Curated annotation (Swiss-Prot):
PANTHER family: DIMETHYLADENOSINE TRANSFERASE, DIMETHYLADENOSINE TRANSFERASE-RELATED
UniProt entry tagged with the keyword Transmembrane: no
SMART domains linked to this entry: rADc
Gene3D superfamilies the record matches: Ribosomal RNA adenine dimethylase-like, domain 2, Vaccinia Virus protein VP39
Record protein name field: Ribosomal RNA small subunit methyltransferase A
Disulfide bonds: none
A GO term for molecular function: RNA binding
Binding site for S-adenosyl-L-methionine: N27, L29, G54, E75, D100, N125
Species lineage: Bacteria, Bacillati, Bacillota, Bacilli, Lactobacillales
Subcellular location: Cytoplasm
Gene: rsmA
Length: 290
């Protein structure tokens, strides 16, 4: 019997006296077919290391451990650590790290894999309230993850895969699409979770590009500029840039020059700029030494 079997899940929770904490956004998956589909979507095999975020009681971890070289699972809730030690006892290729993934030094952590040079894929069922910070943390870690296969609310998946001139488009769209392609693989109904969330989820598969979608002089500055443009979505690009960089005559002259170099109108909003537009703007701002 699988951990994800509903009767097994309930028995594990009862045996350990576990109660769900809303603050951790805990929803445990109880459908083995969907778990297998996640592993198949991520194309997990013995040539891959996996980082899992939020293993819960180990339902997905069990499937990952059977297929991957190694699994490193980050769990913030210390009440789940003894449960995972119990449910995953038969595996010698799983490390459970009792830590908030947002506070983890991932560059150091991945050295704990027996073979840290294998491609690393991230597989996770992320709580809605923290999906964006976690994805940004993973991207900003500069670790060349091969793939993210992540369960999330459809609204967040729409933001990640959004195109310019849409409500969903923003700095998250740019950050992910700069490095990766993003595509919804399938829908996960709310009925297969304990407890059931309020909405259905989707599995979003993000695959690293061979090269970033555009070339920029300074990646960190490029991402900074893209974030600045969306600080106040309803404001013009000019207003957001001057709010961030300053409103002195010298600064405004440099901003005008940079926009002229990048061939971008100051009156448009950030959501109208494509990723190549943001690349041109960031490089132009560097050129004028803002």
């Amino acid at each position: 019997m699988r951990i994800a079997d509903k009767t097994v899940t309930r028995a594990i929770l009862e045996r350990h006296g576990f109660t769900f904490k809303k603050s951790f956004g805990q929803n445990f998956l109880t459908d083995t077919n969907i778990l297998q589909k996640i592993v198949d979507t991520a194309e997990i095999d013995k040539g891959v290391n996996v980082i899992e975020i939020g293993p819960g009681i180990g339902a997905l971890t069990e499937f990952l451990a059977e297929n991957a070289a190694e699994v490193m699972a980050f769990e913030i809730d210390d009440r789940l650590i003894p449960i995972l030690a119990d449910t995953l006892a038969r595996f010698d290729n799983v490390q459970v790290v009792n830590q908030d993934i947002l506070k983890a030094d991932l560059q150091t952590q991945i050295q704990a894999f027996k073979n840290p040079d294998l491609p690393i894929k991230v597989v996770a069922n992320l709580p809605y309230y923290i999906t964006t910070p976690i994805l940004m943390h993973l991207i900003e870690s500069k670790i060349p993850f091969a793939e993210f296969v992540v369960m999330m609310q459809k609204e967040v998946a729409d933001r990640i895969s959004a195109m310019p001139n849409t409500k969903a488009y923003g700095s998250l769209s740019i950050a992910v699409q700069y490095y990766m392609t993003a595509k919804v693989s399938f829908i996960v109904p709310r009925t297969v979770f304990v407890p059931a969330p309020n909405v259905d989820s989707v599995i979003l598969k993000m695959v690293r590009r061979d090269q970033p979608v555009v070339s920029v002089q300074d990646e960190d500055f490029f991402f900074r500029v893209s974030k600045v443009a969306f600080v106040h979505r309803r404001k013009t690009l000019w207003n957001n840039l001057t709010s961030h960089f300053g409103k002195s005559e010298d600064t405004k002259a440099k901003l005008e020059k940079a926009l002229e170099i990048a061939k971008i109108k100051p009156s448009i909003r950030g959501e109208a700029l494509s990723i190549p537009d943001f690349a041109s703007l960031a490089d132009a701002l560097k050129e004028v030494e803002i």
